Design a protein with these regions (language model features):
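Metallocofactor- and cofactor-centric catalytic cores in central/energy metabolism, strongly enriched
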Residues: 1-151, 155-299, 303-387
Length: 387
């Protein structure tokens, strides 16, 4: 099986061909938004960080920004900074250039004379990049070039019974084809980490799985909190999930049955052709998806039993539910229904194949529901993490 995409100068393959207007901090976010609105083919996002952060939080922010620019769905990036933030322009540019050699421009609002002049300059840069991007021709690539991120949010019991197993079957097929699948949400490994650890390819990966789950809980204990106070969420409980351990046993199904080859820290660059890997992310959906996209995922596959509209500005998000009522009620948000597994109408293998076909169609350019609606939520994790 193959898909059509865009080869980048750094060797990676994109499934979208966009220009990113990257705000280096919250103070540059609205300027970046104005720029992107004036250039068809450009995108931006709401960056609430970038200044007044402790060092580990600032590193998370830097990794996400650099990863967004390096993501192969991006042709090139125009970085917009205010000029006095902690995430200084030279630091942001250096972080991006360490990950990729794609086109890169910079605009500092305070240096060019304010918002209007910054917009004028950046719009010109962005239009030049969009024109260059439009000249690229799609090429055919094997699935080994694909990095798929997996996520679940607004879970109910059907997530663990149908949607996540279907995603896991799809994940196994990607791995078998030589591609990469990312299993995320460390908070939802708790109580099931021993099951994941048994699938580790070596002792280092085995120990890292225990390390990230222990560290996640320790972050909460340090401020007198217990992750179980916020997870499962009220929506999870209303849907029928009773404990974090129960939720975790459903969450890990997204990783299928493949060996776990590596564990990556939050938003670090994931190598292609890696098979199944784990990324240390919170359970908060936008913050977790942000990390996987920063890691290089071109497509996100996201299950939700209760229903979720979350999208992303850079990577298409394929929504999956195992709840036929949710699919009927939120059909404008959900792309794929895995409920036939519960009713014995299809096997998990059949659903995995169907879902992979949808992922390939998405990679080839078909819009997801979240893309069509223009949903571009994003968030960045912090030291005291989201549950």
């Amino acid at each position: 099986m193959t898909f059509y995409g865009y080869r980048r100068p750094d060797g990676r393959v994109g499934v979208r061909n966009r220009v990113l207007i990257l705000p280096a901090s919250v103070c540059a976010t609205d300027t970046a938004r104005i720029i992107a609105q004036q250039v068809e083919g450009a995108i931006s996002f709401n960056n609430q960080q970038g200044c007044s952060q402790v060092a580990p939080d600032q590193q998370f922010t830097m990794d996400v920004m650099a990863g967004y620019a390096a993501n192969p769905n991006i042709y090139g990036t125009v970085v917009v900074s205010l000029g006095c933030e902690n995430c200084q322009m030279d630091l942001v540019v250096k972080a991006i250039e360490e990950r990729t050699n794609k086109p890169l421009k910079r605009v500092i609002i305070q240096e060019v004379g304010g918002t209007l002049k910054a917009v004028e300059i950046a719009v010109r840069y962005a239009k030049e990049m969009v024109a260059e991007a439009s000249m690229l021709q799609k090429e055919e690539f094997p699935l080994s070039e694909l990095i798929v991120g997996t996520e679940c949010g607004g879970s109910d019991p059907t997530s663990g019974l149908a949607a996540n197993p279907a995603i896991g079957a799809m994940s196994d097929l990607v791995v078998q084809a030589g591609g990469t699948s990312i299993l995320s949400e460390t908070s939802e490994f708790i109580g099931a980490e021993h099951i994941l650890a048994r699938r580790a390819i070596n002792k280092e990966v085995h120990d890292r799985i225990y390390e990230i789950t222990s560290r996640f809980e320790a972050h909460f204990h340090a401020v007198g909190e217990d992750v179980r106070q916020g997870n499962p969420s009220p929506g999870n409980k209303a849907g029928g999930i009773t404990t974090l351990e129960e939720k975790s046993l459903g969450c890990i199904h997204k990783g299928g049955h493949s060996p776990i080859n590596a564990v990556y820290d939050y938003a670090k660059q994931v190598e292609s052709k890696q098979g199944l890997v784990i990324m240390d992310t919170p359970g908060n959906d936008p913050a977790s998806v942000a990390a996987m996209v920063a890691g290089g995922a071109q497509v996100i596959v996201f299950s939700s039993g209760r229903g979720s509209p979350v999208g992303h500005p850079i990577a298409p998000v394929v929504k999956v539910t195992g709840n036929k009522i949710t699919f009927a009620n939120m059909e404008d948000n959900i792309d794929f229904c895995a409920a036939p597994l519960i009713y014995g109408e299809k096997t998990v293998e059949q659903l995995g194949t169907d879902l992979l076909n949808m992922v390939v169609e998405t990679a080839c350019g078909k819009q997801t529901k979240a893309e069509a609606l223009g949903f571009v939520e994003t968030a960045i994790a912090r030291v005291c993490n989201y549950v």
